[in-house]
Amino acid sequence: MSQSVVVNPRPALKAKLTKEPFSIPNLKPYYKAWPTAVNPDYPGLKVALEARIKNLYPPKKAAKLIQDDYALLSSMWWPRATADRLQTCTFWFLWLFTWDDEIDQSTSDLFIHIHKANDFRKESLEYVKFCLGVGDDETAKWDFQNNPPNRPLIRSLDVIGAHLQKVYNHDQIMTFVNEIDYYMGCQQREQKRKLTGRLPIVAEYLETRMGTSAVTSMLALNEFADGNDIPRDIMTDPKMISLWYEVNMNMSLSNDLLSLRKEIKHGDIDSMVPVLVSARGLTVRQAVKETEAEINRNIERFDQIADALLEEIKLTHPEKVDEVASYIVGCRYNQMANFLWSLTTTRYGLGDMVRDAEGRIPIVIENVN
């Protein structure tokens, strides 16, 4: 009895993506008059972050991380934060990007061996809980007090946790922890799928993408960064949850577009455009156009939900209107920072690329070395 052979569809899809030139669209007009700013403490933060990077990572990796300029991303993300809180949030950014790269790169040992990745995720999550003072019986099994993690990357969470504990209440801390748990769980499901070689349908892709983006963990830091203390019934209001969803969708899709050249080049093709090409039979240009249109709709939805939320708060918590309005502005800063930094960072390699008259970036993957 002959056995059927499962063919990995990814090489054929990568070949298709490589053959068709496309352009990364100019998304700036969709954001209208959304605010942008750079935190005045950016120069000092850059120095502090460079020192931390050199202390945590080997020289070659450190040089690349310094070049990517995560201090600029953080300074645009939280332009109103005080210097000490901005530094803590930036150290979280650094941890998040480097932690994700440990597993997400298809050639890494942790990606290839999922049991090792699962252990890495488990130790990381339990150490997060330990550092934030919300450890449970599972955390106690690790005895981190006497046996800290061997990996400097995981261990570096201690500074972040200590500062958050001084500012956040238990509910705020648990929101942050739960979003990290959500992120790691989605990443695990995505890794399992990638290892099978199977390509997801659009709904399946989005189900994990909204977690692997890690956006909600960063949204959970906004109150810390900007000095807010918003009642939990507001933060769990359906409109606030919808607002978070739209922020997450915006960053996920815009990152999918802006990193597309890099992802195709490296064969990591689990993003919205390749999924649309695979699942719906679109051309690359059609898939890019559909993703662009959804980002436009997403921005419109965000503004509508923000207005509706403020109208509700005027009735239910009139004393909190200004604080919630400030939080919404912070979400706009977050999205603009993500977008503008992605256009210029060396991480995606778009900064020096030629734009056409409409601000689009023509891409020919075959010409990428």
Swiss-Prot record:
Keywords: Lyase, Magnesium, Metal-binding. InterPro entries: Isoprenoid_synthase_dom_sf (IPR008949), Terpene_cyclase-like_2 (IPR034686). One of its GO terms (biological process) is isoprenoid biosynthetic process. Mg(2+) 1 binds at D100. Its EC number is 4.2.3.-. Induction: The expression is positively regulated by the 2 cluster-specific transcription factors hepR and hepS. Signal peptide: none annotated. It holds the Pfam family Terpene_syn_C_2. Its cofactor is Mg(2+). The keyword Magnesium applies. Mg(2+) 3 binds at N248, S252, D256. Sesquiterpene cyclase; part of the gene cluster that mediates the biosynthesis of heptelidic acid (HA), a sesquiterpene lactone that acts as an inhibitor of glyceraldehyde-3-phosphatedehydrogenase (GAPDH) and a growth inhibitor of the salt-tolerant lactic acid bacteria in soy sauce brewing. The DDXX(D,E) motif is important for the catalytic activity, presumably through binding to Mg(2+). This is Sesquiterpene cyclase hepA. The lineage of its organism: Eukaryota, Fungi, Dikarya, Ascomycota, Pezizomycotina.
